[in-house]
């Protein structure tokens, strides 16, 4: 790939890089690669023009190395490129130039008028220069007006452009220039505030680390010989062993293979309480080692880590439009023509062009247009910091309106980590260990919590699991497996009865007893004969009862628990949690039906689950919430909100954040519309000049952005 050095002088080099054009991700890769070179001060890659500008120290920087870094960025894997916008997106030199030129022109005009006592009206030369400066400073508004007129929809730029043209026709060059200069300052301040908002979100989610320590083992020197080397973080690969010391963020998702430490996972889970990690513990990128040292074998790097997926989701979510945003846009679209009409009426009645100009300027509904997107972006960033991944503004708004919640029991209201409590052989030729081993063989590929509990139990007892040739999932019932030439059935008593397997009286008594104790029985049949039984118990989450009480206090009118378990087990759990409405032995389609029934009754329904069988209900609910990013991928992808940890208190935070975001949006609408209305009344009375109108317009827009920015840290320290 060829590079063209367009210019290189005084420590500033501009390089033409065609493959960066229209590719912001590759532009980020270039910025990341070049920034690591010695002597490089700043680098900006511009996707619009396909150029890269590097500011460097001529004494320290190696020009050839910089160019090599640019070339190398073309081959960086996409998943290793940080999820951010290019630095060039934050810099708009022409905007600054417009403000500077406009300010200098106004200063010179002020000197001419008040120092040299020249008349206010400009001569031909002065007017020509002032008009040129006015057109230059007002170019973004004029361009926007032309675009909106071509599309047949007059926007706010049309109002500003109309006022500017009227000023120039009336030879009010100073007024036009002053107004445009003030509006440019206002636009710049809005952009600055929004950039700070985005930067704050990024800093909350993403550390500033750019290197990592990797442990290399030399096979020829023995297994114990190892060397630690420091490498760029984007060169770490899956399988590398990363060494993490105290007060350093873990840069990869993976498993601890050496050492132990106390780790703060708040960036991922929102939980401020540190946890202890030892060999075998899975850890996430973004977690910080508070005390100790660990070596982590990388399972995911870059954008594929949990924190990388969160950042990507947050950036995608900000593009999703909330219904309340459409309200603001409809208002803006209708208000612009109304503003022209009101301004024209004022001109006809008073004959005062300056008054009409003032009304055009004060009527610009820019602040209304900013009201929703700024608040949504800030709230989504806040949620991500708490470990709440909200996939769009529409879901955030819905979260504040939910008045009925459907819970899947296992893994949401219960811990989701059941333990084996009993293993009973029901056939003379079978021992309990055999029953457990063949049950584990049936469940070896399943991620259901009950299956994982059976597998864990065999590992704890050091029982080998026999291989199987084939398996079939019987959704909601159990598993059918073929192993050692035999057919195995593992599941509920209903499954065995459906398959014509006789369930003995002893087995039935065991089943009844276990269900009264809120334990789940799994029956194992081999070649049509019942051979054993395994029981499992899943504890209710300690915070579940308190959270349900608070949900009711917060306006949730109906809470429904769904479970595939037997009614007796469901009854025990429901009684413990104070739930009056529950359904047992439900299939995935039954969960979907339960959600739709509530919707038909007029409720705004939230569905909380964590498994594949919850996916249809999660998709159908007004807002689907997946518990824990460790849940099944299908559930996490289907849900509208994913909670990074399993703390039910986060459900309260979801509703609270949604309500707060809507409150802030309404405040923004109220503030901006009030300013527009008051400005129109004052302007119609002739008490407002075009310059004051521009100042008021800017103030309302900046106030809206600042008000929305408060959501970034709303109750983060609670």
Swiss-Prot record:
Keyword Transmembrane helix on entry: yes
Active site annotation, chain numbering: 408
Compartments, as annotated in UniProt: Cell membrane
Domain spans labelled HMA: 11-78
Entry's EC annotation: 7.2.2.22
InterPro entries noted in UniProt: ATPase_P-typ_cyto_dom_N, ATPase_P-typ_P_site, ATPase_P-typ_TM_dom_sf, ATPase_P-typ_transduc_dom_A_sf, HAD-like_sf, HAD_sf, HMA_dom, P-typ_ATPase_IB
Name this protein carries in UniProt: Manganese-exporting P-type ATPase
Species the sequence originates in: Mycobacterium tuberculosis (strain ATCC 25618 / H37Rv)
Encoding gene, per UniProt annotation: ctpC
């Amino acid at each position: 790939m060829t590079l063209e050095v367009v210019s290189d002088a005084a420590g500033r080099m501009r390089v033409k890089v065609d493959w960066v054009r229209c590719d912001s991700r590759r532009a980020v890769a270039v910025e990341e690669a070049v920034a690591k070179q010695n002597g490089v001060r700043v680098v900006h890659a511009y996707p619009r023009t396909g150029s890269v500008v590097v500011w460097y120290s001529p004494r320290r920087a190696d020009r050839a190395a910089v160019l090599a870094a640019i070339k190398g960025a073309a081959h960086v894997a996409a998943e290793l490129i940080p999820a951010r916008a290019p630095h060039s997106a934050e810099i708009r030199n022409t905007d600054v130039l417009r403000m500077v030129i406009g300010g200098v022109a106004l200063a010179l005009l002020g000197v001419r008028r008040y120092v040299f006592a020249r008349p206010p009206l400009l001569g031909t030369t002065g007017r020509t220069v002032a008009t040129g400066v006015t057109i230059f400073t007002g170019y973004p508004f004029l361009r926007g007006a032309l675009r909106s007129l071509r599309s047949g929809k007059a926007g706010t730029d049309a109002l500003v452009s109309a006022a500017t043209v009227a000023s120039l026709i009336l030879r009010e060059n100073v007024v036009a220039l002053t107004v445009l200069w003030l509006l440019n300052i206002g636009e710049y301040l809005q952009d600055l505030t929004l950039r700070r908002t985005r930067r704050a979100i990024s800093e909350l989610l993403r550390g500033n680390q750019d290197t990592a320590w990797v442990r290399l083992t030399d096979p020829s020197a023995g297994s114990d010989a190892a060397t630690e080397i420091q490498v760029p973080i984007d060169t770490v690969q899956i399988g590398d062993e990363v060494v993490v010391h105290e007060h350093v963020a873990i840069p990869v998702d993976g498993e601890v293979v050496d050492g132990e430490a106390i780790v703060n996972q708040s960036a991922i889970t929102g939980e401020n309480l540190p946890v202890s990690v030892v060999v075998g513990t899975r850890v996430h990128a973004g977690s910080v080692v508070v005390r100790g040292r660990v070596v982590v074998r990388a399972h995911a790097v870059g954008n594929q880590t949990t924190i990388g997926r969160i950042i990507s989701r947050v950036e995608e979510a900000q593009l999703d439009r909330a219904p309340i945003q459409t309200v603001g846009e409809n208002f803006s679209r209708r208000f612009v023509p109304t503003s022209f009409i009101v301004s024209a009426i004022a001109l006809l009645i008073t004959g005062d062009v300056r008054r009409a100009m003032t009304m055009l300027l004060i009527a610009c509904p820019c602040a209304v247009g900013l009201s929703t997107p700024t608040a949504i972006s800030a709230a989504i960033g806040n949620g991500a910091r708490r470990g709440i991944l909200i996939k769009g503004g529409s879901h955030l708004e819905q979260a504040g309106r939910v008045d009925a919640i459907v819970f899947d029991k296992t893994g949401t209201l219960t811990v989701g980590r059941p333990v084996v409590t009993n293993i009973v052989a029901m056939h003379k030729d079978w021992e309990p260990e055999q029953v457990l081993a063949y049950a584990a063989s049936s469940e070896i590929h399943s991620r259901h919590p009950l299956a994982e509990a059976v597998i864990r139990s065999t590992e704890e007892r050091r029982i080998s699991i026999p291989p199987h040739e084939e398996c079939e999932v019987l959704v909601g019932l159990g598993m059918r497996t073929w192993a050692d030439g035999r057919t195995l059935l593992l599941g509920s008593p209903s499954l065995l009865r459906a398959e014509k397997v006789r369930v003995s009286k002893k087995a039935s008594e065991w089943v009844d007893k276990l269900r009264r104790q809120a334990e789940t029985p799994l029956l194992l049949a081999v070649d049509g004969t019942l051979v054993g039984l395994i029981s499992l118990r899943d504890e209710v989450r300690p915070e579940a009862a308190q959270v349900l009480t608070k949900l009711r206090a917060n306006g949730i009118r109906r809470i429904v628990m769904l479970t595939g378990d037997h009614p007796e087990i469901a009854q025990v759990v429901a009684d413990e949690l104070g739930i009056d409405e529950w359904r047992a032995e439900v299939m995935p389609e039954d969960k979907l039906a339960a959600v739709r029934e509530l919707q038909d009754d007029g409720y705004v329904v939230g569905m909380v689950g964590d498994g594949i069988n919850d996916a249809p209900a999660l998709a159908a609910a007004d807002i689907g919430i997946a518990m824990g990013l460790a849940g099944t991928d299908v559930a996490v992808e289907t849900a509208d909100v994913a909670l990074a940890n399993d703390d039910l208190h986060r459900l309260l935070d979801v509703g609270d954040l949604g309500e707060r975001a809507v409150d802030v949006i309404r405040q923004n609408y109220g503030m901006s519309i009030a300013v527009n209305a008051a400005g129109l009344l004052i302007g119609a009375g002739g008490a407002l000049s075009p310059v004051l109108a521009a100042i008021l317009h800017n103030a309302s827009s900046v106030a809206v952005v600042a008000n929305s920015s408060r959501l970034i840290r709303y109750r983060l320290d609670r």
